[in-house]
């Protein structure tokens, strides 16, 4: 069976890479592609935009058609668009892979409610290496976390609009769970002024924005006399695209539920 993958926001950087990754993956093909109404590239061949040649799939201006024509849709866009696409997925009964970040707690709850009716993959990062970092960092935290200060440092390109990154928050959540802390209660997002001594229960987040950095994430475990650092550096967005396509191929076989890359990689 060949899976028909739909891609929203297909003219953006991630959208084009998702088309390329879908075209190169075994067992799937590009089934539909869309952009926001009025986009200048509506009507163009999505394959040509992605540099893989004509695929016969034209960029549409109606996302509803994408969800109707595809077996599964991958959405890397912005929060407002993703929530609108989620409603289309519900209406069509189409599984969806969400790569958008920056959701509020209430918006994440909307995604969880949708997953009661359709299969949803919602992950902060689709790179296999990053998800291994989550797993390894949690294991390290379980051993060291009670005695070590924990800090997370992330860096991204100048155009990223949310901070800390969804990946940094996912890393923090994995670590917090391992040391039996509530991340909402112990997270410190940057420091300035007379902050006082560090509370050993906190997990600090530092954000760097600049240049064309695809994504760097480091978990630091520090105590007197030593420091352990675990780092993942992404050099190409293609690693995210490949992971998302892998997730799309997996989720079409699943029953309704909320999944992440740990399910796909067998970490749970």
From Swiss-Prot:
Primary site of residence: cytoplasm
Superkingdom of the organism of origin: Bacteria
Keyword Amino-acid biosynthesis in annotation: yes
UniProt-annotated binding residues for (S)-2,3,4,5-tetrahydrodipicolinate: 157, 166-167
GO cellular component: cytosol
Protein name (database record): 4-hydroxy-tetrahydrodipicolinate reductase
Gene3D superfamilies listed in its UniProt record: Dihydrodipicolinate Reductase, domain 2 (3.30.360.10), NAD(P)-binding Rossmann-like Domain (3.40.50.720)
Family: Belongs to the DapB family.
Pathway: Amino-acid biosynthesis; L-lysine biosynthesis via DAP pathway; (S)-tetrahydrodipicolinate from L-aspartate: step 4/4
Subcellular location(s) per record: Cytoplasm
Species per Swiss-Prot/TrEMBL record: Magnetococcus marinus (strain ATCC BAA-1437 / JCM 17883 / MC-1)
Binding locations of NAD(+): 9-14, 35, 99-101, 123-126
């Amino acid at each position: 069976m060949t899976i028909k993958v739909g891609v929203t926001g297909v003219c953006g950087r991630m959208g084009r890479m998702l088309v390329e990754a879908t075209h190169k993956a075994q067992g799937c093909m590009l089934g539909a592609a869309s952009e926001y109404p009025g986009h200048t590239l509506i009507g163009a061949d999505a394959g040509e935009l992605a540099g893989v040649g004509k695929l016969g799939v034209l960029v549409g201006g109606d996302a509803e058609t994408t969800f109707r024509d595809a077996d599964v849709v991958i959405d890397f866009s912005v929060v407002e668009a993703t929530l609108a696409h989620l409603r289309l997925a519900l209406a069509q009964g189409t599984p969806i892979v969400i790569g958008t970040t920056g959701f509020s707690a209430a918006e994440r709850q909307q995604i969880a409610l949708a997953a009661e009716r359709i299969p949803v993959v919602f992950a902060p990062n689709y790179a296999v290496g990053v998800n291994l970092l989550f797993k390894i960092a949690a294991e390290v935290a379980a051993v060291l976390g009670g005695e070590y200060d924990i800090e997370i440092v992330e860096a991204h390109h100048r155009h990223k609009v949310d901070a800390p990154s969804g990946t940094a928050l996912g890393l923090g959540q994995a670590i917090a769970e391992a040391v039996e802390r509530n991340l909402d209660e112990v997270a410190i997002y940057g420091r300035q002024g007379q902050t006082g001594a560090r509370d050993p229960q906190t997990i600090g987040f530092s954000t760097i924005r600049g240049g064309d950095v695809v994504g760097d994430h480091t978990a630091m475990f520090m105590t007197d006399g030593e420091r352990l650092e675990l780092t993942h550096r992404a050099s190409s967005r293609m690693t995210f695209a490949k992971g998302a396509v892998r997730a799309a191929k997996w989720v079409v076989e699943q029953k309704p539920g909320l999944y992440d890359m740990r399910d796909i990689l067998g970490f749970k």
